[in-house]
C-alpha cells in the first residue's frame, strides 16, 4: 500500500483525466480539482488566451503556480494538465503529494476523442497526428517515471475505466487524508 494525501491523475490530453477523475472523486468522496481550471480561475483567462498572450512558457509558469497551490491540500483527486510533467519541480511535487495514476491512451484513440475539440492550443495545426506522436514520445517516459499505477484507457468507457481503477486502487492506495 502506498499512503498519499491526494490521488493525482496524469496523462496526455484525451486520456480521460477530467471525466474519469470526476467519477473517481465521487466514488472515493474526494474533492475534484482540475489544475487547468485552477489556472483559468487564477489568470482570469482561458487557456487558449493565455497561450496566445504568453506563449507556452507563460502558460507553464501559470501551471507551476496553480499546481503548487492545489497540492498544498489533501483529500483531493487532482487532474493535471498533460504537460505538467515537463517541469522537474512539478514532477517532484506530484510524486511527493499524491498517489499517481497514469491514464495512458494511444494516439489513434486521442485523435478520435479530440476530433471536435477546438480548445487545445497545441493541436490547432493541420498535423495533429504528428503533434500527438511527438508529445507522446517526449512525455510518455515522464508519465511512466512518476506513475504508481498505469491504466490504458483505450478499451474502456469512462465508467468502465473508473470501475477498473476502483478495484486496482483498493489494493494499492492507502488514503492519508482522513488523518491529520
Swiss-Prot record:
Mg(2+) binds at residue 18. Substrate binds at residues 36, 60, 82, 139. ATP binds at residues 14-19, 120. One of its GO terms (biological process) is aromatic amino acid family biosynthetic process. InterPro entries: P-loop_NTPase, Shikimate/glucono_kinase, Shikimate_kinase/TSH1, Shikimate_kinase_CS. The keyword Magnesium applies. Keywords: Amino-acid biosynthesis, Aromatic amino acid biosynthesis, ATP-binding, Cytoplasm, Kinase, Magnesium, Metal-binding, Nucleotide-binding, Transferase. Its cofactor is Mg(2+). Signal peptide: none annotated. Its main location: cytoplasm. Monomer. Catalyzes the specific phosphorylation of the 3-hydroxyl group of shikimic acid using ATP as a cosubstrate. HAMAP family: Shikimate_kinase (MF_00109). PANTHER family: SHIKIMATE KINASE (PTHR21087), SHIKIMATE KINASE 1, CHLOROPLASTIC (PTHR21087:SF16). This is Shikimate kinase.
